[in-house]
Protein backbone atom coordinates (compact mmCIF):
# COMPACT_ATOMS: atom_id res chain seq x y z
CA UNK A 1 0.00 0.00 0.00
CA UNK A 2 2.84 2.40 0.84
CA UNK A 3 4.61 1.63 -2.44
CA UNK A 4 1.36 2.22 -4.34
CA UNK A 5 1.00 5.62 -2.65
CA UNK A 6 4.51 6.67 -3.63
CA UNK A 7 4.12 5.34 -7.17
CA UNK A 8 0.79 7.12 -7.57
CA UNK A 9 2.33 10.42 -6.52
CA UNK A 10 5.24 9.91 -8.94
CA UNK A 11 2.89 9.23 -11.85
CA UNK A 12 0.70 12.21 -10.94
CA UNK A 13 3.70 14.53 -10.74
CA UNK A 14 5.09 13.37 -14.08
CA UNK A 15 1.75 13.58 -15.90
CA UNK A 16 0.76 16.97 -14.53
CA UNK A 17 4.29 18.29 -14.94
CA UNK A 18 4.35 17.25 -18.58
CA UNK A 19 0.96 18.85 -19.23
CA UNK A 20 1.92 22.10 -17.50
CA UNK A 21 5.26 22.32 -19.27
CA UNK A 22 3.40 21.98 -22.55
CA UNK A 23 0.97 24.68 -21.46
CA UNK A 24 3.82 27.03 -20.65
CA UNK A 25 6.10 26.03 -23.47
CA UNK A 26 3.58 26.65 -26.24
CA UNK A 27 2.94 30.15 -24.96
CA UNK A 28 -0.81 29.72 -24.66
CA UNK A 29 -2.69 32.76 -23.28
CA UNK A 30 -3.74 33.07 -19.67
CA UNK A 31 -7.10 31.45 -19.16
CA UNK A 32 -9.25 29.68 -16.63
CA UNK A 33 -10.94 26.31 -16.97
CA UNK A 34 -14.26 26.30 -15.04
CA UNK A 35 -14.99 22.99 -13.31
CA UNK A 36 -18.01 23.58 -11.08
CA UNK A 37 -20.01 26.22 -9.25
CA UNK A 38 -18.33 26.99 -5.94
CA UNK A 39 -20.54 29.60 -4.27
CA UNK A 40 -23.92 31.00 -5.31
CA UNK A 41 -25.54 33.26 -2.73
CA UNK A 42 -27.89 36.04 -3.77
CA UNK A 43 -26.16 38.12 -6.39
CA UNK A 44 -22.74 36.69 -5.55
CA UNK A 45 -21.50 33.80 -7.65
CA UNK A 46 -18.12 32.20 -8.15
CA UNK A 47 -16.91 29.01 -9.81
CA UNK A 48 -14.15 26.53 -9.10
CA UNK A 49 -11.80 27.42 -11.93
CA UNK A 50 -8.27 26.23 -12.68
CA UNK A 51 -6.18 29.14 -13.94
CA UNK A 52 -2.99 28.49 -15.88
CA UNK A 53 -0.30 31.11 -16.45
CA UNK A 54 3.42 31.39 -15.79
CA UNK A 55 3.22 31.95 -12.02
CA UNK A 56 0.56 29.31 -11.33
CA UNK A 57 2.39 26.76 -13.49
CA UNK A 58 5.59 27.43 -11.56
CA UNK A 59 3.83 27.06 -8.21
CA UNK A 60 1.99 23.87 -9.25
CA UNK A 61 5.30 22.35 -10.36
CA UNK A 62 6.89 23.36 -7.05
CA UNK A 63 4.02 21.96 -4.96
CA UNK A 64 4.05 18.65 -6.82
CA UNK A 65 7.84 18.33 -6.63
CA UNK A 66 7.98 18.98 -2.89
CA UNK A 67 4.93 16.79 -2.27
CA UNK A 68 6.55 13.96 -4.21
CA UNK A 69 9.65 14.13 -2.01
CA UNK A 70 7.50 14.25 1.14
CA UNK A 71 5.45 11.24 -0.01
CA UNK A 72 8.58 9.23 -0.84
CA UNK A 73 10.12 10.03 2.55
CA UNK A 74 6.84 9.30 4.35
CA UNK A 75 6.55 5.91 2.66
CA UNK A 76 9.95 4.97 4.08
CA UNK A 77 9.30 6.55 7.49
CA UNK A 78 5.86 5.05 8.05
CA UNK A 79 6.92 1.61 6.82
CA UNK A 80 8.46 1.04 10.25
CA UNK A 81 5.10 1.46 11.99
CA UNK A 82 3.21 -1.66 13.02
CA UNK A 83 -0.20 -0.13 12.29
CA UNK A 84 -1.26 0.80 8.73
CA UNK A 85 -0.88 4.50 8.01
CA UNK A 86 -3.78 4.90 5.58
CA UNK A 87 -5.12 7.85 7.55
CA UNK A 88 -1.75 9.59 7.46
CA UNK A 89 -1.47 9.37 3.69
CA UNK A 90 -5.07 10.50 3.29
CA UNK A 91 -4.21 13.64 5.29
CA UNK A 92 -1.03 14.14 3.26
CA UNK A 93 -2.94 13.84 0.00
CA UNK A 94 -5.55 16.29 1.30
CA UNK A 95 -2.76 18.76 2.03
CA UNK A 96 -1.44 18.42 -1.52
CA UNK A 97 -4.91 18.83 -3.02
CA UNK A 98 -5.62 21.95 -0.95
CA UNK A 99 -2.29 23.49 -1.89
CA UNK A 100 -2.91 22.82 -5.59
CA UNK A 101 -6.38 24.36 -5.27
CA UNK A 102 -4.80 27.42 -3.70
CA UNK A 103 -2.07 28.04 -6.28
CA UNK A 104 -4.31 27.34 -9.30
CA UNK A 105 -7.22 29.49 -8.11
CA UNK A 106 -8.87 32.05 -10.34
CA UNK A 107 -10.34 34.18 -7.56
CA UNK A 108 -9.94 34.97 -3.87
CA UNK A 109 -12.80 32.72 -2.72
CA UNK A 110 -11.24 29.61 -4.22
CA UNK A 111 -7.89 30.72 -2.83
CA UNK A 112 -9.47 30.95 0.62
CA UNK A 113 -10.97 27.45 0.33
CA UNK A 114 -7.52 26.11 -0.54
CA UNK A 115 -6.00 28.20 2.25
CA UNK A 116 -8.35 26.72 4.84
CA UNK A 117 -7.85 23.24 3.39
CA UNK A 118 -4.12 23.56 4.01
CA UNK A 119 -4.86 24.65 7.59
CA UNK A 120 -7.18 21.69 8.16
CA UNK A 121 -4.68 19.21 6.72
CA UNK A 122 -1.91 20.70 8.88
CA UNK A 123 -4.09 20.29 11.98
CA UNK A 124 -4.84 16.66 11.10
CA UNK A 125 -1.19 15.83 10.37
CA UNK A 126 0.15 17.50 13.52
CA UNK A 127 -2.42 15.65 15.62
CA UNK A 128 -2.04 12.34 13.78
CA UNK A 129 -0.79 10.60 16.93
CA UNK A 130 -3.94 11.54 18.83
CA UNK A 131 -3.02 9.24 21.72
CA UNK A 132 -0.08 11.52 22.56
CA UNK A 133 -1.11 14.56 24.66
CA UNK A 134 1.74 16.67 23.27
CA UNK A 135 0.65 16.06 19.67
CA UNK A 136 -2.98 16.83 20.46
CA UNK A 137 -2.08 20.06 22.26
CA UNK A 138 0.22 21.08 19.39
CA UNK A 139 -2.54 20.48 16.84
CA UNK A 140 -5.00 22.62 18.80
CA UNK A 141 -2.44 25.42 19.20
CA UNK A 142 -1.70 25.40 15.46
CA UNK A 143 -5.40 25.43 14.63
CA UNK A 144 -6.23 28.33 16.97
CA UNK A 145 -3.26 30.54 15.99
CA UNK A 146 -3.93 30.02 12.29
CA UNK A 147 -7.62 30.81 12.70
CA UNK A 148 -6.73 34.11 14.36
CA UNK A 149 -4.53 35.00 11.38
CA UNK A 150 -7.17 33.74 8.95
CA UNK A 151 -9.66 36.18 10.45
CA UNK A 152 -7.51 39.03 9.17
CA UNK A 153 -7.19 37.27 5.82
CA UNK A 154 -10.92 36.84 5.28
CA UNK A 155 -11.60 40.44 6.37
CA UNK A 156 -9.05 41.51 3.77
CA UNK A 157 -10.87 39.51 1.10
CA UNK A 158 -14.18 41.02 2.22
CA UNK A 159 -12.74 44.52 1.97
CA UNK A 160 -11.48 43.74 -1.53
CA UNK A 161 -15.03 42.78 -2.51
CA UNK A 162 -16.44 45.95 -0.95
CA UNK A 163 -13.94 48.16 -2.79
CA UNK A 164 -13.74 46.40 -6.16
CA UNK A 165 -17.15 44.64 -6.21
CA UNK A 166 -15.44 41.43 -7.32
CA UNK A 167 -13.08 38.70 -6.12
CA UNK A 168 -11.85 37.78 -9.62
CA UNK A 169 -8.13 38.40 -10.01
CA UNK A 170 -8.46 40.03 -13.44
CA UNK A 171 -11.14 42.46 -12.30
CA UNK A 172 -9.36 43.40 -9.08
CA UNK A 173 -5.92 43.89 -10.65
CA UNK A 174 -7.35 45.96 -13.49
CA UNK A 175 -9.12 48.26 -11.02
CA UNK A 176 -6.16 48.77 -8.67
CA UNK A 177 -4.84 51.94 -10.42
CA UNK A 178 -8.21 53.65 -9.91
CA UNK A 179 -8.19 52.77 -6.20
CA UNK A 180 -4.65 53.92 -5.39
CA UNK A 181 -5.78 57.14 -3.71
CA UNK A 182 -8.97 55.83 -2.09
CA UNK A 183 -8.90 56.27 1.70
CA UNK A 184 -10.78 55.27 4.84
CA UNK A 185 -10.69 57.26 8.05
CA UNK A 186 -9.52 55.26 11.08
CA UNK A 187 -9.50 57.07 14.44
CA UNK A 188 -9.55 60.38 12.60
CA UNK A 189 -6.57 59.46 10.44
CA UNK A 190 -7.04 58.90 6.68
CA UNK A 191 -5.50 55.60 5.58
CA UNK A 192 -5.27 54.30 2.05
CA UNK A 193 -7.61 51.40 1.39
CA UNK A 194 -4.97 49.38 -0.43
CA UNK A 195 -2.63 49.69 2.55
CA UNK A 196 -5.34 48.30 4.85
CA UNK A 197 -6.04 45.43 2.46
CA UNK A 198 -2.35 44.57 2.10
CA UNK A 199 -1.87 44.66 5.87
CA UNK A 200 -4.81 42.31 6.47
CA UNK A 201 -3.63 39.84 3.84
CA UNK A 202 -0.07 40.04 5.18
CA UNK A 203 -1.16 39.16 8.72
CA UNK A 204 -3.00 36.15 7.31
CA UNK A 205 0.18 35.04 5.55
CA UNK A 206 2.18 35.62 8.74
CA UNK A 207 0.05 33.12 10.61
CA UNK A 208 0.32 30.45 7.93
CA UNK A 209 4.09 30.84 7.59
CA UNK A 210 4.67 31.15 11.36
CA UNK A 211 6.29 34.58 11.25
CA UNK A 212 6.93 36.92 14.18
CA UNK A 213 4.21 36.96 16.89
CA UNK A 214 2.26 34.21 15.10
CA UNK A 215 5.01 31.60 15.26
CA UNK A 216 4.44 29.77 18.61
CA UNK A 217 2.51 26.94 16.92
CA UNK A 218 5.46 25.86 14.74
CA UNK A 219 7.91 24.56 17.41
CA UNK A 220 5.04 22.74 19.12
CA UNK A 221 3.96 21.24 15.79
CA UNK A 222 7.17 19.20 15.70
CA UNK A 223 5.71 17.13 18.52
CA UNK A 224 3.19 15.82 16.03
Labelled PLM ranges:
Residues 1-224:
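...captures the hydrophobic TM-helix bundle architecture rather than a specific catalytic motif
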Amino acid sequence: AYAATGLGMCVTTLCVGNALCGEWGYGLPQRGEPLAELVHAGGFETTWTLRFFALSVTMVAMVLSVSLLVHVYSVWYMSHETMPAYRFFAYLSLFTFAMLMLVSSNDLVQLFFGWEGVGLASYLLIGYWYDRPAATAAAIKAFVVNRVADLFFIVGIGLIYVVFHSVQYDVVFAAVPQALMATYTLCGVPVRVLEIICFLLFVGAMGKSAQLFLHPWLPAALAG
